[in-house]
A protein has these predicted regions:
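Short phosphate-coordinating micro-motif centered on Lys-Gly-acidic
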Residues: 7
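Hydrophobic transmembrane alpha-helices and their helix-loop junctions in integral membrane proteins
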Residues: 1-2, 11-178
């Protein structure tokens, strides 16, 4: 359900930026939509991999975790394949470096209220999804690949902070401080 509603949320985001935005609004709306849909393709592959790796009976996260005995029944090699896919999918949504390039254009072209929704809700869904799905259902791969998390989040923090410091437009400051 989370994936489905995340995809449905792209439609109003595209319209809010593309119709009521300013500046290069069509470019920003299309870039946001295409990048988030590209991330969704990776995420969908990861979700289907988790579904089939867990027995293919349900898409409910709690039922999968209970059915697989705390998610350790998914083979380690499969976890190493599905975890990066879910991580990239949620990383694009959360605007994690290097998947953040949609964020500055989307924030700058969006109406102010939509820009705040991006920073306050949409981008946080990426981090929530990564913790709730990827790390909860694929714990062995998350533990083994945690160094990648640390490197990318460290780069995101430093890059976002320095990029926000040199901006003069308030929407770009908001965009880079959200990376």
């Amino acid at each position: 359900a989370m994936f489905m509603f995340y995809e449905i949320a792209l439609i109003p985001m595209y319209l809010l930026i593309g119709v009521w935005g300013s500046g290069r609004k069509e470019y920003a709306a299309m870039k946001l939509t295409l990048m988030l849909m590209g991330g969704s393709a990776f995420l969908m592959c990861g979700i289907f991999g988790i579904f089939y790796g867990a027995g293919g009976n349900t898409m409910n996260i709690i039922d999968i975790a209970n059915h697989t005995g705390g998610a350790h029944a998914i083979a380690h090699n499969w976890q190493l394949l599905w975890f990066p896919m879910t991580f990239v999918g949620f990383g694009v949504l959360g605007a994690l470096f290097p998947f953040h390039t949609w964020s500055p254009d989307g924030h700058a072209s969006a109406p102010t209220a939509v820009s705040m929704l991006h920073a306050g809700v949409l981008m946080k869904l990426g981090g929530y999804g990564c913790f709730r799905i990827a790390m909860y259902l694929l714990p062995e791969a998350a533990n083994e690949l945690s160094w990648i998390f640390l490197v990318l989040t460290g780069i995101s923090v430093v890059y976002g902070a320095f990029s926000a410091c040199v901006q003069t437009d308030l929407k770009y400051i908001n965009a880079y401080s959200s990376v």
